[in-house]
Amino acid sequence: MLYPSGVLAEAKPPDTEQADTKQLPTEGRSHPPVLLLHGFIDNRSAFVLLRRSLLRHGWRHVTALNYSPLTCDLRRAAEQLGRHIEEVCTRTGHREVDIVGHSLGGLTARYYVQRMGGAARVRTVVTLGTPHSGTRIAPALSAHPIVRQMRPDSDVIKELTLPAPGCRTRFFAFWSDLDELMVPVDTARIEHQDLNAQNVPLKGVGHLALPVHGAVAAGIRQALTDAEGAQPTAGTRESGGASVA
């Protein structure tokens, strides 16, 4: 009963590979599995449209992970993510996965990759409105420990500034000039000399609209496709701005 609000995690994510969604015949047959990670006080339903978009364009393994906001430590959420990735790899026969994370979900994915050895399993991380440098949101929201970990002065954010030599995972950070929960808005960009990261600016997309906007979904599909066969290159790059309002 509490699961739909995100207060309790699911015991087992649904088998989204069996979704009643028509797949296109030729595209994406070799794509790694995609894991979708929602944001704070949300649940996997935030990714209904994106999951459908990926399946329709040929992705075969798309799984949305529910986790509980009662989890008070992002590090524990990252551990849970690691266990789920191992389960997905075992079930699908793939050796690596791609991750799309909205807000807190993106920060959890990045922490797993950078600080817990997840680069060995994660090919690509796409983040949507994720506070990579921390966000100065309303102080009242900081009553929750995991929200405090998303503030600029938190130990988690400081850990993510540490060197990450040899990290092979490719990052795409989508950030919007209209993201009301990212303060300042460019905190959703990745700035790290050791990471192979590309920042993708958007115009006119609010925080909650990022995982459901059709044009953003197209950009995510393109990012996941571009990552195939790409050679690891450290350093941050900037994409041209895109208006999707």
Predicted regions and their residues:
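Post-His helix in hydrolase/transferase enzymes
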Residues: P211-T225
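Serine-dependent carboxylesterase/thioesterase catalytic core
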Residues: V34-S45, L49-R168, F174-W175, L181, ...
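A generic fold-level signal
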Residues: G28-R29, A120, G166, D194
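Short alpha-helix in the alpha/beta-hydrolase fold that links the catalytic acid
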Residues: L50, V183-I190
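Catalytic histidine neighborhood in serine/cysteine hydrolases
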Residues: R60-H61, Q193-L210, I220
